Amino acid sequence: MNGTMRYRPLGKTGITVSEIGMGLWAAGGDAWGKTEDQEVLRAIDYALDHGVTFFDTADVYGNGHSEELLGKAMAGRRDKFIVATKIGWRNFDGEKGQSAYTTVEAFIAGVESNLKRLNTDYIDVMQSHIDFRDPTMEVFLEGFQRLKQAGKIRAYGVSTSNFEYLKAFNHDGKTNTLQIDYSILNRTSEKDILPYCQKQGLGVIIRGAIAMGILAGKFTADTRFGEGDFRRRWHENPEEYQVFLKDL
């Protein structure tokens, strides 16, 4: 492990991770502007060289392309990576307001697709990407437990900022992790969610630590984002944009 990176246990999972992880939403190439595959692979190599072991992706990032790139990067060195991915939004039925996985069998088949794209036989942390009380929550939970028993996932959790949903998801105390948006601009989880996670032994995975780039010191009121970057909405919707600008 890198001498300057720090590592810590991920809650009660028994998994040790680098304190800084690499999120791979942008690697999908369909939400943060155009990305080049070789650039993504070089970035992953750079992260590894600097002690990063934790990599987070999802089936919906680039419609699976982000997972495929991570799988390519892991070839021949799977043991260097702690892989977290997600399931739920891919093929989501907006009219019914539920995921495509209405049976445990369908859900397990969905995770098998994650495994195939990642080119691995196990996932370290498998997460529900659904962040509200989806009718199929119980399907996800049973599926996660079966997959864990089969050795195809080491731990499971949920990505949500909804405290009531988190408690429902963890009603049996078997959930391992929570992924949540948290930064110096968004500290609302300090009131209820983070104390709950500490009490329950949940590993907390922070997303949005630099607030989608706002805290990187690169943006001004005149910044405009390119085609394919969802942040274009910030200046297309002045009211939303002002919410961000006031915190710069």
Predicted regions and their residues:
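Short, acidic/polar
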Residues: 34-47, 102-118, 160-168
